[in-house]
Amino acid sequence: MNDATRDENGHPAPSQPTRAGTVEAWDIARIMHAIPHRFPFLMVDRVIGVERDVSCVGVKNVSINEHYFQGHFPSMAVMPGVLIIESMAQTAAVLVVATLGDDAAGKLVYFMSVEGAKFRKPVVPGDQMHVHVRKERRRGNIWKFSAEAKVDGKVVAEASYAAMILDR
């Protein structure tokens, strides 16, 4: 890759699609370049693997310093299920950007629906949650995904959902 296809940190620019069949890791700077979410709502700390048009694995390090633990719940901190789902959606947004490459410029990924959400085990401070997202299908600007969140290799949550890719 030449310098024109790298960002200011020397990483492959998110506007460049990954080659089909290759798996890439993304650091937080590259994630923040790709999706608009910021503290306190950025729910992906790292991507350990993204395969264009197929799947993405994101990582969320769950810390007691997360703002939501002040109220959920003070005596027994548990990551809210809706934020686990949000982590899945943000990981899917990374997959969309990796897949679309330059065509992702000026687009946003809008969460449309969630189905079959199941929460198997609480996610607590100190956990490292791995979010596995797979693209199930794409029709025009509507994408469907399935996802599992895992801690220590065990499924803690799962869901299927749809997103719409629209201009900003």
Segments (PLM) and residue ranges:
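Short beta-strand edge segments in extracellular beta-sheet folds
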Residues: 150, 162-166
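Catalytic strand-loop segment that frames the active site of acyl-thioester-processing enzymes
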Residues: 39-79, 84
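Hydrophobic small-molecule pocket/channel-lining residues, especially in calycin-type beta-barrels
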Residues: 64, 77, 150, 154-158
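Mixed-charge, low-complexity intrinsically disordered regions
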Residues: 1-35, 46-48, 72-78
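Terminal leader/tail segments of proteins
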Residues: 2, 48, 54-63, 69, ...
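Helix-adjacent hinge/juxtasegments
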Residues: 71-103
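Hydrophobic beta-strand-centered segment that forms part of the acyl-chain substrate-binding groove
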Residues: 2-4, 16-25, 92-130, 156-158, ...
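Hydrophobic beta-sheet segments that form the core/acyl-binding groove
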Residues: 47, 113-152
